[in-house]
Amino acid sequence: LNNQNHCISIFTGNLPPSKALFLRLENAFLICNTYEIIEIVSFKEFIETELRAWARLKGHLYLGREKLKNQYSYKIQKIVKNDYLQKASWGKKMQGIDTSNPKLKDLDLSDDILVKAPDNNGLLTRGIVTQENSPIYDFELYYKEQVWSNPISVLYEEGKNLQWNATTDIPWNEIPNLNPVLEKAICQIMTYLVENEFSALYIPAKFVSKINPYYMEVPLFLSSLMNDEARHIEVFTKRANANGGGFQYSSEVTQKSLFSLFKEDDYIKSSFLLHVMGEGTFVDLLSFLEKYMPDEATKKIIRLSKRDEMRHVAYGIEHVKSAIEQNPNRINALKNTAFKRKEFMDEVNGESSLLIESLAILAGGSDEPDAYKRGFYLVEELKQKMNENRVKRLINIGMDEDLANDISKVHTPNFM
């Protein structure tokens, strides 16, 4: 036995042959390589029969016993094939621990992030070693270019740092009594916002379980994004019901527009329509609302929500931009997606008239003819600004200016 070098030595003391002892052996042999030898050091002299039987049962080779000073050495060689094809890492300590500020970007889970997730990567992430014969999950989104956005770790940290509470962070009792016409306009706007936020919540939820968690940062970020949208639904619902009003009307054009978003099953196309086109335009709408809301409490609601939405847009821009860089042919696919959506929306004439009127009343301050006319003009200016900013975002992701203009012009009149 002296010539048979062992790779692992397990001290079992006075443990008798039992479930506790065999559990330790089971795990030791599970992670060692084929033909490696494991030494069991025990105070027990007469456990050879049980160890030989266990080794035979598991397909290993019992090599024998050696008398040591006050204890005994038993050696078993692993014969069966490896359960793990690589060793787990050890000795790692991530940055930020010593300052009690570890960030997601500081994790060093692997030498590289592969362009394609390993086929056997189940509900686990980089750095976890998978046992052979584990089930294959068949995640639909398993290429990095399908899901990745370069600033995703930073955006995730930002989302945590900028969390706010829709109950305690809004001075609800400071909302003043408003003219019923103005309050009704605000309630109609809040109704519309809630509808759109439900789409922004449900659409990422469709895709989270399809993303291979090898790219861990993506489902984590999308989960934080969904938490943002849930908070927006809550806060807009509360504002609609905070001041003697309540929810108002949903329009066919709004629901049809959101349905065209919801039914898109390609993640890159969905990210393009939702984050780049929709939420990007939504940010301009929120800037408009923040400017013209008549009270500070409602302004704060809009301002905090807009800050979240800007983070979502940042993810989408970098996600789609990266996907286009990897495959420029995607530009044509995204163009076709935008025009296909327009064809679907052409079945409904115009825009949500209830929303546009409410925006005009809000911006003008009342429904008096001159004020309403002024507000309507401001809404038309908003639409132009939305178009200009959409073009900028489309150029940013890699489209030429002419195509960017064409795609922006066919964007849904529902804004989202």
Predicted regions mapped to residue ranges:
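Intrinsic disorder
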Residues: 1-119
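Terminal targeting/low-complexity segments that flank the catalytic cores of oxidoreductases
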Residues: 24, 85-220, 241-246, 253, ...
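Short glycine-/small-residue-rich flexible loop motifs, especially phosphate/cofactor-binding loops
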Residues: 52, 237, 287, 391
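Short, surface-exposed basic-aromatic patches at helix termini and helix-loop junctions that form
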Residues: 53-59, 241, 291-294, 325
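Alpha-helical transition-metal enzyme core signature, strongest for iron centers
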Residues: 55, 193-201, 222-240, 272-283, ...
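Amphipathic alpha-helical segments within well-ordered protein domains
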Residues: 205-209, 287-290, 303, 317, ...
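Active-site-proximal alpha-helical scaffolds that flank and shape metal-associated catalytic sites
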Residues: 238-313, 340-341
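A beta-strand-loop signature enriched in Asp, Gly, Thr, and Trp
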Residues: 301-305, 316-341
